[in-house]
């Protein structure tokens, strides 16, 4: 404000009066500078009365009235000065100040510019003009005003610092930095410039330089409040919490009632884990500034951390009452609603937060997470990408986007996201765990184990990582601290169930651990409830279902839902069933949840079902369920359960009146939306019905089925070469199989038929005997040619016009035959030598994945091998990294390494066929061989099992019961060992049991898909009749034997 009283008008008064006027003018000026405006005005009025035309006095009066907010009086005296001297630039500038204060910015700017035209070197005019231009939004004009002032006086370090502030606000950080540096060069002790320069470095991410400059500012000016606050803020962001606290406390010593500083200090306490102290400090900030939404929001965060969720919710709501557009409170309140299960309200709040603040990265990420939970994967992906666009170093968003991409089957995209999250934040435990899961699903178990362990080092209390690590260790048979691991895993599940959290153990893995039946059922139930949560957001009204078959011309419509219509064990088991249903009474729909894999398995189901619908092309669960309902399905069959590719949300929507679990999942769904589980008396005894959420629906023999007779008919017959027999004919040293086997044998001379006695069924293998005819090729030139082909690794030879192929070369001869899609057309030779198996030993085998082996199972096997000296155990490298662990534990149990032989995993046809080479299969009691059990039994190899308490541990007993081989089912560990030892030491007994299995696989119902389909139809009709009569689902444990097609 121009207020000079210099250059007063000339006077003819005596010298004494002149001095008196001059002295009074100087006194008034000093009083003005000191802020004593009342005294300054009083003395100026004396001067004005003495000299009413003195422009210096008029300017000072204008300035005094301006400072006292008497704008009209200020304008009056400026106008008087202009009347006295129309060229007085300071008067125009003072008048501009009045206009600016009144908000009349254009008038103010015009007066400042007029002042500068009158006096081009008028520094205050430039400064005032710059301020007005900033207020008017003309930033570039303001910059030019400051530059003009500095051209006249380059040493104005305050003006240069102000110019730096303006440039910083414009984002021109390098130019701002140059201004601050020049100001410091001009005045090294100018604390404000040091602090401002610290702000620039902070904005540029140069944290340590920012800290240095803020510390320099407070050193120069120990009472510089803003510098202490800035220092505290940057130390807080750098997570140097102790020094941040010290800076904030110093600021509070300068300004004890500074609410924002109290709030920032509380944030540091919160980050330090001093939750109670943080809460108290937030409350102090609110006490000082009751209308402080940030403090309420942060207080709520601390209260939530302490577990006071209801109080936290109140605080978020208070913050929103104070500021309905407080984005952080909207976002954080949404988090609470989400945790409470109020998903729709959470979505509404997240969307509101984004309306208020579209560039809110955390809200985008949180909304995306909920959308992913609802199955809206594309929309979720869009919001994750927005979050990352806004915040390119947002590690959480990268990690969560990886989860979405993983669910969308984009494994490479997920891998890139997790890797990027870890690059941004190497200490991000969740990202390490997610990366581990990708490795786990890809079969890279060692990498998965390493990543899970890294996650647990970073975050020791991490149930998901611990339980997944436990599963990985189970996969590779790493039993280090096994008992302790199992105890901890059980305690984790117990705590999670008690707190109503989603358990970290997957339902499909629960059978591997010593969990109670109640826990296993509860784990499945939680996953079933997740499906309900996903479909509830669709707000679909319940479907209306028919009570009769009028609309389907009296036929029962059955819908099979699976992601495994293709090259998958489930299709290997049931692919013929859709085409075997009675077309007069059943209409079959197959709903594929996965795209066409191009295999014959898919083609067969597509061709033989009445209707085949690819639901993978309808990703929306609501629309897919609509399609099922429109098809008028009466019984909808869930063949996935909680296995990969499942869409249980379809069943949660209940598009069919009856919904049943069948075949593909070895356990209960735990879901209210599944009515029945198709099982049998051996697998699911009625006395354990409480283990299931579904009602038990019994098949008369076994619920399990295999399509082996259709896929592998060439294994119905076999011939052997009499190789090193020493008078004893073995049926599993060198074996020939083929569709044309009989014709080939007829072309050979000297083929002998050896009669193999075998029990004729029943519990007692010695009760009665029948003979099986086994062709034996003697050692002659033909046999020698076959053996030479094997020894030399030849792919195929021709004998008497028949193609004889090496059993290891089926993939090279016919890949579709190797996968089981076609029946091999050649005679295939399978030998023990191909797999490094001893010719003269008893070969026990197990072809399951290694995760089904536990320490107690390996101990039983070791005991058996010790009791049968000339014996070996044949396992698969499934996975290969498990082999050294098994070998090490076996050696610790006293077994030499050569007693366990490992082979690689083989294509399906070879896998089934080579099972003939083993003498006995030793089943895994923890989780039986299900499909592999059927495979080995079709190969004619006896399987010893010991049923446990879970469905998964009783399937083999069900298969053997159906086969009529009860003598192979043990009731205890000791009996299991004794059965296996008797088979390994009593060769006549072994021969009889092998003959029985070889015969019964053809004559029993186990592999009879036509009979099985008829029995299944009868069960479906029971379900329908029960429903049509108006009854709720109930156990169906007295199935009717089928004598003719239902």
From Swiss-Prot:
SUPFAM superfamilies: TPR-like. One of its GO terms (molecular function) is N-acetyltransferase activity. Gene3D superfamilies: 3.30.720.150, 3.40.50.11380, Glycogen Phosphorylase B, Tetratricopeptide repeat domain. GO terms for cellular component: cell projection; cytoplasm; cytosol; glutamatergic synapse; histone acetyltransferase complex; mitochondrial membrane; NSL complex; nucleus. It is an enzyme of class 2 (transferase). A motif (Nuclear localization signal) lies at residues 487-503. The modification N-acetylalanine is found at residue 2. Residues 991-1010 are annotated as: Required for phosphatidylinositol 3,4,5-triphosphate binding. Its main location: cytoplasm. The TPR repeat domain is required for substrate binding and oligomerization. This is UDP-N-acetylglucosamine--peptide N-acetylglucosaminyltransferase 110 kDa subunit. The lineage of its organism: Eukaryota, Metazoa, Chordata, Craniata, Vertebrata. The gene is Ogt.
């Amino acid at each position: 404000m121009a207020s000079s009283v210099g250059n007063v008008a000339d006077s003819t008064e005596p010298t004494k009066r002149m001095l008196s006027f001059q002295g009074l003018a100087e006194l008034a000026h000093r009083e003005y500078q000191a802020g004593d405006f009342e005294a300054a005005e009083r003395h100026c009025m004396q001067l004005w009365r003495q000299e009413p035309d003195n422009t210096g006095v008029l300017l000072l009066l204008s300035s005094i009235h301006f400072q006292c907010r008497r704008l009209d009086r200020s304008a009056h005296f400026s106008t008087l000065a202009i009347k006295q001297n129309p060229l007085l630039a300071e008067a125009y500038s003072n008048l501009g100040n009045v206009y600016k204060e009144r908000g009349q910015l254009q008038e103010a700017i015009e007066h400042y510019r007029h002042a500068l035209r009158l006096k081009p070197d008028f520094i205050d005019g430039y400064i005032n003009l710059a301020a007005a231009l900033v207020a008017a939004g003309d930033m570039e004009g303001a910059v030019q005003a400051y530059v003009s002032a500095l051209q006249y006086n380059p040493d104005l370090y305050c003006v240069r610092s102000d110019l730096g502030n303006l440039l910083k606000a414009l984002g021109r950080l390098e130019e701002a930095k140059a201004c601050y540096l020049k100001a410091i060069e001009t005045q090294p002790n100018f604390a404000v410039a040091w602090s401002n320069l610290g702000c620039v470095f902070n904005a540029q991410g140069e944290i340590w330089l920012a800290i240095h400059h803020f510390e320099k500012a407070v050193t120069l000016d120990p009472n510089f409040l803003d510098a202490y606050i800035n220092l505290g803020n940057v130390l807080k962001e750098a997570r140097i919490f102790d020094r941040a606290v010290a800076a904030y406390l110093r600021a509070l010593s300068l300004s004890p009632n500074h609410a924002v500083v109290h709030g920032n200090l509380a944030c540091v306490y919160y980050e330090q884990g001093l939750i109670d102290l943080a809460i108290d400090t937030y409350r102090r900030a609110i006490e000082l500034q009751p209308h402080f939404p940030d403090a309420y929001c942060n207080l709520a965060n601390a209260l939530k951390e302490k577990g006071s969720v209801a109080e936290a919710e109140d605080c978020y709501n208070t913050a929103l009452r104070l500021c309905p557009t407080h984005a952080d409170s909207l976002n954080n309140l949404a988090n609470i609603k989400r945790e409470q299960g109020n998903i729709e309200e959470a979505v509404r709040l997240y969307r509101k937060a984004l309306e208020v603040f579209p560039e809110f990265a955390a809200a985008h990420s949180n909304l995306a997470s909920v959308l992913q939970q609802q199955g809206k994967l594309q929309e979720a992906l869009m919001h994750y990408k927005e979050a990352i666009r806004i915040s390119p170093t947002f590690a959480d968003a990268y990690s969560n986007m990886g989860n979405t991409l993983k669910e969308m089957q984009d494994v490479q995209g997920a891998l890139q996201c997790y890797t990027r999250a870890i690059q941004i934040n190497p200490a991000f435990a969740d990202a390490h765990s997610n990366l581990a899961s990708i490795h786990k699903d890809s079969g890279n178990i060692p990498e998965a184990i390493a990543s899970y362990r890294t996650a647990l080092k970073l975050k020791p209390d991490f149930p998901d990582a611990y339980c997944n690590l436990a599963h990985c260790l189970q996969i590779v048979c790493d039993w280090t601290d096994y008992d302790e691991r199992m105890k901890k895993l059980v305690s984790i599940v117990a705590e999670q169930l008690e707190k109503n959290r989603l358990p970290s153990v997957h339902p499909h893995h629960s059978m591997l651990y010593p969990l109670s039946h109640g826990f296993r059922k509860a784990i499945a139930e939680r996953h079933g409830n997740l499906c309900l949560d996903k479909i509830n957001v669709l707000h679909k009204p319940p479907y209306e279902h028919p009570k009769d078959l009028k609309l389907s011309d009296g036929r029962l419509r059955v819908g099979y839902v699976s992601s495994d219509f293709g090259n998958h064990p489930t299709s290997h088991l049931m692919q013929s069933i859709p085409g075997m249903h009675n077309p007069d009474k059943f209409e079959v729909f197959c709903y594929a949840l996965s795209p066409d894999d191009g295999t014959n398995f898919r083609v067969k189901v597509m061709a033989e079902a009445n209707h085949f619908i690819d639901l993978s092309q309808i990703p929306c669960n609501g629309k897919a369920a609509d399609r099922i309902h429109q098809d008028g399905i009466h019984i909808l069959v869930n063949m996935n359960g909680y296995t990969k590719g499942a869409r249980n949300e379809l069943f949660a929507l209940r598009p069919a009146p009856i919904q049943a679990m069948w075949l593909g999942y070895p356990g209960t769904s735990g879901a209210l939306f599944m009515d029945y589980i198709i099982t049998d008396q051996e697998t699911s005894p009625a006395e354990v019905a409480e283990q299931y959420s579904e009602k038990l629906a019994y098949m008369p023999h076994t619920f399990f089925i295999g399509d082996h007779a259709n896929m592998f008919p060439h294994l119905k017959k076999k011939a052997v070469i009499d190789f090193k027999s020493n008078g004893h004919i073995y049926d599993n040293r060198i074996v020939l199989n083929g569709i044309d086997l009989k014709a080939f044998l007829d072309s050979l001379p000297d083929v002998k038929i050896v009669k193999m006695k075998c029990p004729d069924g029943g519990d007692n293998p010695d009760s009665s005997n029948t003979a099986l005819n086994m062709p034996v090729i003697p050692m002659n030139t033909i046999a020698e040619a076959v053996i030479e082909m094997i020894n030399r690794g030849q792919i195929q030879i021709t004998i008497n016009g028949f193609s004889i192929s090496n059993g290891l070369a089926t993939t090279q001869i016919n890949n579709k035959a190797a996968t089981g899609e076609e029946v091999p057309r050649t005679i295939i030779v399978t030998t023990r030598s191909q797999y490094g198996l001893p010719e003269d030993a008893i070969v026990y085998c197990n072809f399951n994945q290694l995760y089904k082996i536990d320490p107690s199972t390996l101990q039983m096997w070791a005991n058996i091998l010790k009791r049968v000296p000339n014996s070996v155990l044949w396992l698969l490298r499934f996975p290969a990294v498990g082999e050294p662990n098994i070998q090490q534990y076996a050696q610790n149990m006293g077994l030499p390494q050569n007693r366990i032989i490992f082979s690689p995993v083989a294509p399906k046809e070879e896998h089934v066929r080579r099972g003939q080479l083993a003498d006995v299969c030793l089943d895994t009691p923890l989780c039986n061989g299900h499909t592999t059990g059927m495979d080995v039994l079709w190969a004619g190899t006896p399987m010893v099992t010991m049923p446990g308490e879970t469905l998964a541990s009783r399937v083999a007993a069900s298969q053997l019961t159906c086969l009529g081989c009860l003598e192979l089912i043990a009731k205890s560990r000791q009996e299991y060992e004794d059965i296996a030892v008797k088979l390994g030491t009593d060769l006549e007994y072994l021969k009889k049991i092998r003959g029985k299995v070889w015969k019964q696989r053809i004559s029993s119902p186990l592999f009879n898909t036509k009979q099985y389909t008829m029995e299944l139809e009868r069960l479906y009709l029971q379900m329908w009749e029960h429903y049509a009569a108006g009854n709720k689902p109930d156990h169906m444990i007295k199935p009717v034997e089928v004598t003719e097609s239902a």
